[in-house]
Amino acid sequence: MPFNPLERAFSWKHLTATNQISSKSGMLHTITINRGDPAAASIVTVYDGIGVTADIIAIIILDTALYTVPTTLVFDCGYLTGLYITFSAVTLADITVSYK
């Protein structure tokens, strides 16, 4: 059978603030750090759920001293309840999340 690139396609969302990505089970593929804030590091927390009381998948420090941007972090992990992402502060940082 010929290769169909759409069979492996992921949805994506570009975020600059706290956001509910999904409210059902799925797979977190990647998080790309597009820009960090040189003035103040922000912490991004990734939850398996629909709010901040859910299980934590990852805590990511967005600091331009730590990353060369853009940087893509590969997770390829499942989530059971949903995918919720918070930013610790309003900064110039932004990320792109790809998921199924």
Question: Where do the model's predicted regions map?
Answer:
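Surface-exposed, low-hydrophobicity beta-strand/loop segments enriched in small/polar/acidic residues
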Residues: 1-100
